[in-house]
């Protein structure tokens, strides 16, 4: 049944008309605005983000000892990073606050830290450095934490083992420690050794290219360490897709003009 509308005619009489009313909205439709994801689901994001990690904190500590034994101490170091964090009031509970701080810490993995001149490769425990506090009438509370990290600090002239991910004329792209991208300049030895994708090579570090907290290393080819095994047809197709992704990423990085070099 529609709504009644009273209309006054020219002769002074009043006429009643019924107007069609809109169909009632479904309850689910009314609450759609509540389902808009304005933020990140910490538990889901944390789980998917952890699957991308190539090194945990304990493995990082073992690798530090191993590198010290080889006389390469200082390339991989343990650091404690102080950080100020502000969180909304609905995360003021102990469990929620710990989850949030841990998630924030995990997002530093793979990022360049200017204060250390290195790249975070693993994150350990997050310790509370100060009690949560409220400032004026802000819609968030504040706290300070100490994040235990493993940081890779590259040094000019050092040589690192890298796995080749992409090869083109004049340039190769590889990863150091399976997570840090490095652009490798080719030379005469490259063609002699017939470097291909998934080969393990030795690279001489020559610099770093930084854009905000993102970065990639630069280096020159030194020698072949280990040739990759010959793969089956299905694996080759997957590799081709991965090579295409890397190629697009390299093109995007080359288009950046405002990068800072060290």
From Swiss-Prot:
Transmembrane segment boundaries? none
Q: Where is this region: Disordered?
A: 1-30, 232-262
Regions of biased composition (Acidic residues) lie at 9-21, 232-245, 253-262
GO (cellular component) term, any one: P-body
Q: One GO molecular function term?
A: single-stranded DNA binding
Q: Which Gene Ontology terms describe the biological processes this protein takes part in?
A: nuclear-transcribed mRNA catabolic process; positive regulation of nuclear-transcribed mRNA poly(A) tail shortening; positive regulation of translational initiation; transcription initiation at RNA polymerase II promoter
- Annotated signal sequence is none
**Protein name, entry field:** Uncharacterized protein F10E9.4
* Species, as recorded: Caenorhabditis elegans
């Amino acid at each position: 049944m529609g709504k009644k509308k009273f209309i006054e005619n020219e002769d002074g009489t009043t006429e009643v008309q019924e107007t069609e009313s809109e169909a009632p909205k479904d309850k689910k439709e009314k609450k759609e605005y509540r389902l808009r994801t304005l933020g990140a689901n910490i538990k889901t994001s944390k789980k998917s983000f952890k699957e991308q990690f190539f090194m945990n904190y304990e493995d990082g500590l073992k690798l530090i000892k191993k590198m010290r034994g080889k006389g390469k101490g200082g390339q991989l170091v343990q650091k404690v990073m102080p950080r100020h964090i502000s969180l909304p009031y609905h995360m003021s509970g102990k469990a929620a606050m710990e989850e949030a701080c841990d998630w924030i810490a995990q997002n530093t993995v793979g990022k360049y830290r200017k204060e250390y001149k290195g790249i975070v490769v693993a994150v350990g425990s997050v310790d509370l450095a100060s009690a949560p506090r409220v400032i004026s009438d802000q819609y968030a509370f504040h706290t300070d934490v100490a994040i235990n990290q493993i940081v890779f600090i590259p040094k000019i002239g050092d040589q690192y083992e890298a796995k080749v991910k992409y090869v083109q004329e004049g340039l190769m792209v590889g990863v150091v420690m399976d997570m840090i991208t490095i652009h490798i300049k080719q030379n005469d030895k490259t063609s002699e050794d017939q470097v291909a994708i998934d080969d393990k090579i030795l690279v001489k570090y020559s610099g770093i290219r930084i854009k905000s907290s993102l970065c990639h290393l630069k280096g020159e080819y030194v020698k072949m360490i280990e040739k990759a095994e010959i793969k089956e047809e299905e694996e080759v197709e997957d590799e081709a897709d991965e090579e295409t992704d890397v190629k697009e990423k390299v093109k995007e990085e080359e288009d950046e003009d405002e990068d800072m070099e060290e």
